[in-house]
Each structure stands twice: as C-alpha cells, then as structure tokens.
Amino acid sequence: MRVYLNGEYLEQARAAVSVDDRGFLFGDGVYEVTRARNGRLFEAGRHLRRLERGLEALGIAPPPGFEPGGGALLEIADRLLRDNGLMNGDALVYLEITRGVAERTHHFPPAGTPPTVFLRTNRLAAPDDVRERGATVITTPDLRWERCDLKTVQLLPNVLAKQQAVTAGAFEAVFVRAGIVTEGASTNVFVVIDGAIHTHPATQRILPGITREIVLELAAERGLRVVEQAVPLEELRGASELFLTSTSTEVMPVARLDGGAVGSGRPGPVARQLHAALRERL
C-alpha cells in the first residue's frame, strides 16, 4: 500500500515520521477522514472546509499549494486511490497535517517551520452486520477538553472511551457531560423522542460531523422534525430510537444502551429511512 508523506509517494513500510514531529510529541495537528466510492470523494468540499477551520484555529499554515481549497490534496488522494487499486467500491482517505518537526518546546516553533502532510487510503468495510441487528452502546463521563469541535489528532480520551466500549462488548461509548449527552467516541448521536429527532447542537462540545450535517439535511428534506438541543441522559434512556452517524459507520441504529433495550430493541424506522437516504446520496 502506497502513502503520501511530505512530497513523496512511497510504500507504507518506508514512510517514516521524525521523532521530533509535534504530532508525535504533542498531538499537535489536525486530521480528516473522507469516504470515496468508486474513486469519487464524497463531500470532499465539506471535509476540506472543516480542515481549513481546524488549521486556522490551531495556527498551522499549510505548505504553499496545499491550502484546503487549492486542489493539491484532492490530486494526492486521487493518485493514492488509483495506485492502491481502490477505484471500485468503498474506501477511506486519511489526511493528517501536523505543526511539523522542531525542537521539543511547548510553544510554537519558529515561523516557517514546514508542517508535516500525510495521506493514506484503505478499503472500507462497513459494519452492516451490526447495523442489521442494531448496535450496543454504553455511556461514559465526558472528560475531554473544551474544543471538541476541532478534529485534532489528540484523541486519548476517545481512545480510552472506545476501549471501555470494547471491553464491555459494545460498539460505541457515548459521552455524557453534567447529565447531558454530547456525542460518541467516534460518532455523533441522534435520539428520537415523541417522533422528533434530537441531537446536540454544533457547539464546542461536539465535533460537527460531516455525516451529521448531511443527515440533518436528509431529515429536513423528508419532512422529519429535527431539534438541535442538548438531550439529558434520562431522556436518552426513554427514547424510541437512538442512532449514531459518522463517515465510516454511516447511520448506525442502536438496539441496546447500558444493558437495556432502546425502544423495541431493534433498528427503528427513522434510522432505517435516513440510512437508506444516505446510501442514495452516496
């Protein structure tokens, strides 16, 4: 499998990032994961706009020609998909930009330090078996920082929450902060209450997921009522449906929450409808 690293296309085994890279030392960088179907990137513009916002917030200037709207990143992604035989079916493109290689200091390195740019691709195997029966999820305290809206590579709290889910035999861990449901370790969370779809508003408490954004549009197009407001944990437990969204999981209905059934204990009609609509959009 070939990857791109700082101007070079090379075999993954030959790709090496410096031990002084700030992404390695501090988690000082941002990333994006974009879906490709039959070689076509899905909603690449939205992903690149979110990347640009993250770079600006962190004060990382991409190399000349690599501005998110400049096209170079799309050209690299296209070449990797072709080189790796991923022009048919579903694939993922992973992109990471860090603040680059510099002496280890907590403050920013000198102006002009080249950022590290890395892209890779891989085949996507959607978890359709889990979707068919409905996922099992657990809740866990949300102990993350206050800028969850930035897609940074510093994901340790998410890693710990995901491992907690795996240990419990669950698909996902859902964060709860001060009694309010925020999002999943790697997903956004939607809840159906009294026929209306509820999801946490796009504040600094959650990542503004691209699939989340699209699902909100699909719901509105179908006349479904959507409420973007905080959902207390107690309401989550009494919801008729609960589902998750992300680039790789698409729309994932939840059948069990913390050991108890969600609604009927089977994938619900709203989640099924929105997943079918998303598949049509893909």
Segment roles from a protein language model:
Residues 176, 180-202, 208:
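Glycine- and Gly-Pro-enriched alpha-helical subdomains that act as flexible
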Residues 1-173, 178, 203, 217-282:
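Conserved alpha/beta cores of soluble small-molecule-handling proteins
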Residues 209-214:
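Feature captures the catalytic cores and cofactor-binding loops of soluble hydro-lyases/lyases
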